[in-house]
Amino acid sequence: MESPRNHGGSEEEEYSSCESGWTMYIEDAFHGNDQSSVVVDDDDDDTQVKEADDGYENDDGDTSDDGGDEESDDSMASDASSGPSNQLPKHINKHAARKNGSKQVYLQKRQHTEKTISNEGEKSDLKARTRTSAASRVQSRGKVSKTK
């Protein structure tokens, strides 16, 4: 593997060993060392590949870099793990739904726990009343048996 290069920083600055060739390629493009029109946004979740606006206009007044009807070769812009960009909004919605779903599960568990505590309180009150009434029955039987 090629050793990490310094891209416009001081000579003392070093890159970590986990930096990939893609990162260096993208940094070159970003800092103007390359004429590439591809920018990769590598967040914690997914990698997104976007075409950057380089500000140059084509002969027909269009600012895109596609060269007319020609199909662009963006094999260098993505890897096998990245899917079509139209899947990103679905993933975000699923993530938000999953996040809200976990809140809903938490609230349901909390409500269930509160109901259980409430039911246990009612059960203990019922047991206390039952004990009191059973004790009073025993006392009343004792009185009845003494009178006979």
UniProtKB/Swiss-Prot annotation:
Query: Per UniProt, what does mutating P84R do?
Result: Impaired function in cytokinin-mediated development
| Effects seen without this gene | Plants missing both SOLF1 and SOLF2 have reduced endogenous cytokinin levels and accumulate lower levels of trans-zeatin riboside monophosphate (tZRMP) and N(6)-(Delta(2)-isopentenyl)adenosine monophosphate (iPRMP), biosynthetic intermediates of bioactive cytokinins as well as decreased response to exogenous cytokinin in both callus-formation and inhibition-of-hypocotyl-elongation assays.
Q: Which InterPro entries match?
A: SOFL
Q: Which GO terms describe its biological process?
A: cytokinin biosynthetic process; cytokinin metabolic process; cytokinin-activated signaling pathway
**Free-text tissue specificity from the UniProt record:** Predominantly expressed in the vascular tissues of seedlings, developing leaves, flowers and siliques, but barely detectable in roots and stems.
UniProt lists compositionally biased (Acidic residues) regions at: 54-76
Principal location listed in the UniProt entry: cytoplasm
Q: Where is this motif: SOFL-A?
A: 20-25
Which residue windows does the record flag with biased composition (Basic and acidic residues)?
Answer: 1-10, 111-128
Q: Which domain of life is it from?
A: Eukaryota
Signal peptide from the UniProt entry? none
UniProt keyword list? Cytokinin biosynthesis, Cytokinin signaling pathway, Cytoplasm, Nucleus
Compartment list: Cytoplasm; Nucleus
Q: Which intervals of this chain are the motif SOFL-B? A: 75-84
**Record flagged with keyword Nucleus:** yes
The UniProt-reported impact of T23I is:
Impaired function in cytokinin-mediated development
Q: Which GO terms describe its cellular component?
A: cytoplasm; nucleus
- Function comment: Involved in cytokinin-mediated development. Together with SOFL2, triggers the endogenous content of specific bioactive cytokinins derived from the biosynthetic intermediates trans-zeatin riboside monophosphate (tZRMP) and N(6)-(Delta(2)-isopentenyl)adenosine monophosphate (iPRMP) such as N-glucosides trans-zeatin 7-glucoside (tZ7G), cis-zeatin 7-glucoside (cZ7G) and N(6)-(Delta(2)-isopentenyl)adenine 7-glucoside (iP7G).
- Give the similarity note: Belongs to the SOFL plant protein family.
> What's the protein name?
Protein SOB FIVE-LIKE 1
The protein's gene is named SOFL1
